[in-house]
Amino acid sequence: MTLTLYNTLTRKKEPFVPLEEGKVKMYVCGPTVYNYIHIGNARPAIVFDTVRKYLEYKGYEVQYVSNFTDVDDKLIKAANELGEEVPVIAERFIKAYFEDVGSLGCTKADCHPRVTENMDEIIDFIQTLIDKGYAYEADGDVYYKTRSFEGYGKLSHQSVDELRSGARIQVGEKKEDALDFTLWKAAKDNEISWDSPWGKGRPGWHIECSAMARKYLGDSIDIHAGGQDLAFPHHENEIAQSEALTGKPFAKYWLHNGYINIDNEKMSKSLGNFVLVHDIIKEHDPQVLRFFMLSVHYRHPINYSVELLENTKNAFGRLKTAYSNLQHRLKSSTNLTEGDSEWLEKIEEQRKAFQTAMDDDFNTANAISVLFDLAKHANYYLQEKNTAEHVIQAFIQLFDEICSVLGFSLKEQELLDKDIEELIEKRNEARRNRDFATSDQIRDQLKSMNIILEDTPQGTRWKRGES
């Protein structure tokens, strides 16, 4: 089956044909690093990491770029509130981001460009737009002349006139038209800034991604992706900037993941109902959170609650049990061949079902259903009096194959010594801070992994329990 994906630009599923055969250039909008990421930030990280993994599974060479916005209004506000420098805060939360998404099974992008490290390219991009008549300077600010770009609105499927009716010029803005948007902001007093032809300032949000995508991936890319909330105005404005500058299509396919609701309400900071990944993975297996995110098609909204996550944990546990039973039975299996072709055919059918699911716009929900079907077949097979080693190996291999694409593992994780030492140090720190709930949670976590702790006057000792 041919891989098809839903393109927001055309509002339909299309066969995937990359610009260059066998290669995929992919850009995913990353976070603004002023705090720990919430589960709304985690969803695109997980979803598009899975898209990347499946493209690689199909044999494509994927060049994957995802940025960090490490200077903007939110970071400046956080810096003022905390009495710290913007780069210090950005660095702290970039480190935290890698820790969080790493625990969720996300592979690092080939490149994670930062706005502050690409300022020359951003300034050059803006100057070229001015030279071409698509932008103008006004008292140190630079604005994009939206009506000058003929295709504006093609991603969000809105006409300029429709957009104009809701547009307003805010106090302090010097734009000529309410539809125009900021490319460069003149610096305020005591605010982080960079020199430019228009005076000291910093870039607007939209220009950053256009400039960095072009620098690291070229004028035209295959896939541009992000959350549904970015389609307008962010991605719409990226198209206007990039295509005005190059005269070429910016991205062939636009992918957007759906919203996350918390207990059936849309997640928002105004409602105070956002949940940090940092907090969830203190109490829940990060793999379960990833499994939960992929259990719904990426374009559909997903409802999060602790109860639903617990249900997911139980479902994930059933798969781990089936996998564990296969590994255990492997030790007593023989070279039996009678009836094995029938079981091998069933396994191959499940492989094809997985590929069919993923070829249909990366339908991870259906792919996970295939895992449960595979587990059901495995459980039936294990009821046989005699089992063949190569059949069990085939079951295990397909489980591993599917899970490697979906980004989790059914294997029991054995902690490395350094990981154990790090957990013990976190527990000791919690005890020093009289955070006994965290201390007990880490002890229980280690106990579940067969690690036995002994607290002594000289410190905490540990050993692995008997298998």
Curated annotation (Swiss-Prot):
Its EC number is 6.1.1.16. It is found in: Cytoplasm. A motif ('KMSKS' region) lies at residues 266-270. Its main location: cytoplasm. GO terms for biological process: cysteinyl-tRNA aminoacylation. ATP binds at residue 269. Zn(2+) binds at residues 29, 209, 234, 238. A motif ('HIGH' region) lies at residues 31-41. It comes from the Bacteria. Keywords: Aminoacyl-tRNA synthetase, ATP-binding, Cytoplasm, Ligase, Metal-binding, Nucleotide-binding, Phosphoprotein, Protein biosynthesis, Zinc. InterPro entries: Cys-tRNA-ligase (IPR015803), Cys-tRNA-synt_Ia_DALR (IPR015273), Cys-tRNA/MSH_ligase (IPR024909), CysS_C (IPR056411), Rossmann-like_a/b/a_fold (IPR014729), tRNA-synt_1_cat_dom (IPR032678), tRNAsynth_Ia_anticodon-bd (IPR009080). Monomer. NCBIfam families: cysS. HAMAP family: Cys_tRNA_synth. Belongs to the class-I aminoacyl-tRNA synthetase family. This is Cysteine--tRNA ligase. It comes from Bacillus licheniformis (strain ATCC 14580 / DSM 13 / JCM 2505 / CCUG 7422 / NBRC 12200 / NCIMB 9375 / NCTC 10341 / NRRL NRS-1264 / Gibson 46). The lineage of its organism: Bacteria, Bacillati, Bacillota, Bacilli, Bacillales.
